[in-house]
Amino acid sequence: MPTKARIRLWSTNIENLNFVVNQIKTLAQKTGVEISGPIPLPTSRMEVPVMRLPHGEGKKKWEHWEMKIHKRIIDIASDERVMRQLMRVRVPDDVYIEIELI
């Protein structure tokens, strides 16, 4: 029974994340390996309110900075040659990947 690899990807840049996901999908289609996904997970949103005035006197005006973290999961049959090709996929600096054999 072939094992599966669960690939978790996350990034703050959605375009780069989708680029890597499409590379993995085309790799799986070329090799004819079974793939399920990409499954989009809920986007984490972190908001940090910061007071504009450095000294704290006068009117209190706030700036709100936010960062969104987008996540995807892909399950792929872990054939040895597919895993080797998967390691060669070019990944931008702001996309993070975890590979887990299940």
UniProtKB/Swiss-Prot annotation:
Q: Which GO terms describe its cellular component?
A: small ribosomal subunit
Q: Which UniProt keywords apply?
A: Ribonucleoprotein, Ribosomal protein
Top-rank lineage group of the source organism: Archaea
Q: Note the SMART domains from the entry.
A: Ribosomal_S10 (SM01403)
Record-level GO BP terms: translation
State the family it belongs to: Belongs to the universal ribosomal protein uS10 family.
Q: Give the quaternary structure.
A: Part of the 30S ribosomal subunit.
Tell me what this protein is called.
Small ribosomal subunit protein uS10
